[in-house]
Swiss-Prot record:
Pathway: Nucleotide-sugar biosynthesis; GDP-alpha-D-mannose biosynthesis; GDP-alpha-D-mannose from alpha-D-mannose 1-phosphate (GTP route): step 1/1. Involved in cell wall synthesis where it is required for glycosylation. Involved in cell cycle progression through cell-size checkpoint. This is Mannose-1-phosphate guanyltransferase. Belongs to the transferase hexapeptide repeat family. Keywords: Cell cycle, Cytoplasm, GTP-binding, Nucleotide-binding, Nucleotidyltransferase, Transferase. It is an enzyme of class 2 (transferase). It comes from the Eukaryota. It catalyses: alpha-D-mannose 1-phosphate + GTP + H(+) = GDP-alpha-D-mannose + diphosphate. Pfam families: GMPPB_C, NTP_transferase. It comes from Gibberella zeae (strain ATCC MYA-4620 / CBS 123657 / FGSC 9075 / NRRL 31084 / PH-1) (Wheat head blight fungus). GO terms for molecular function: GTP binding; mannose-1-phosphate guanylyltransferase (GTP) activity.
Length: 364
């Protein structure tokens, strides 16, 4: 089996984190985002994975070499000299994707969910047509492009309606697909949108089906969604009874859904949770309050600080009695002074915050 991950470019929506590392290598729940996807593909029997990239492929090649060996798979990089949108990368990787007649998976690198690849493969084979897209239900379909099925058919897609004014359905494209190799004949090697060009042509030929995703789903490509996706992921681990989570019986765990790397150090009288991930070598002082936040490797939170709805970048330090909230994102090696208040915004790498930030801003 084969799979292609649409990695894309600069990851601007997730800055300042992506100023330091490519977006797929940013840790989500203490594991690089792309590793979540690779593990799910491997579990479904995929042995050949293509990463479609146009930014810093050499960094990812070096990092992912160990996973090739660990999983016994082949990872190839398909490097775009110009951005090819969402369909062009499939054509660029045709040599690999069409090396045999088996279908192949495609997924967007920003998506985190309970990846259903094994069930998706079985469903795709059962209907025998060219493509299947995974769809997920949303509460406000008017914000999205909605999938509409043919009358009397539960999976065959009739059309897509972009941001419908009237209710026509509540299922949207989840950014996970499986295709037969024949789809490559529909795509030219140029910037091409799979959603706007390829899918409508497949629908016209009655060749595109949908598959309902069970469980959580989130595009975590920007900070507020990264935090929301973390909450959903941790809740999913709780429902599964995962041993990865820190035991709720620990005296510092408050509300559950807490994931702490074993190398992290936690001070006295802390209240951590719900929905917190703490990475390797993080140091938490005494009396610290953490809620709905992500602390990346090597960061430090000093005594009695309050951190909520915040992503703390690698090797950053939050001072004593500081308070951060309202979707604050600290880049790599940021220092927040003692007793400082930060009410949202982004702080670029290697900066020091010495005055309160009352209005969300970009600190350069």
């Amino acid at each position: 089996m084969k799979g292609l991950i649409l990695v894309g470019g600069y990851g601007t929506r997730l800055r300042p984190l992506t100023l330091s590392v490519p977006k797929p290598l940013v840790e989500f729940a203490n594991k690089p985002m792309i590793v979540h996807q690779i593990e799910a593909l491997v579990a479904a029997g995929v042995t050949d994975i293509v990463l479609a990239v146009n930014y810093r492929p050499e960094v990812m090649e070096k990092f992912l070499a160990e996973y090739e060996e660990k999983f016994g798979i082949n990872i190839e990089f398909s490097v775009e000299t110009e951005p090819l949108d969402t369909a062009g990368p499939l054509k660029l990787a045709e040599r690999i994707l069409a090396k045999d007649d088996s279908p192949f998976f495609v997924l967007n690198s920003d998506v985190i969910c309970d990846f259903p690849f094994e069930d998706l493969l079985a469903f795709h084979k059962s209907h025998g047509n060219e493509g299947t897209i995974v769809v997920t239900k949303v509460e406000e379909p008017s914000k999205y492009g909605v999938v509409v099925h043919q009358p009397g058919h539960r999976s065959l897609i009739d059309r897509f309606v972009e941001k419908p004014v009237e209710f026509v359905g509540n299922r949207i494209n989840a950014g996970l697909y499986i295709f037969n190799t024949s789809i490559l004949d529909r795509i030219e090697l140029r910037p091409t949108s799979i959603e706007k060009e390829t899918f409508p042509a497949m629908v016209k030929d009655n060749q595109l089906h949908s598959f309902d995703l069970e469980g959580f789903w989130m595009d975590v490509g920007q900070p507020k969604d990264f935090l929301s996706g973390t909450c959903l992921y941790l809740s999913s681990l709780t429902k599964k009874g995962s041993k990865e989570l820190t035991s709720p019986s620990e005296p510092f765990v408050h509300g559950g859904n807490v994931l702490i790397d074993p190398s992290a150090k936690i001070g006295k009288n802390c209240r951590i949770g719900p929905n917190v991930t703490i990475g390797p070598n993080v140091v938490i002082g005494d009396g610290v309050r953490l809620q709905r936040c992500v602390l990346l490797k090597g960061s430090k939170v000093k005594d009695h600080a309050w951190v909520k709805s915040t992503i703390v970048g690698w090797n950053s330090t939050i001072g004593r009695w500081a308070r951060l909230e309202n979707v604050t994102v600290l880049g790599d090696d940021v220092t927040v002074g003692d007793e400082i208040y930060v009410n949202g915004g982004s702080v670029l790498p290697h900066k020091s915050i010495k005055a309160n930030v009352d209005i969300p801003a970009i600190i350069m």
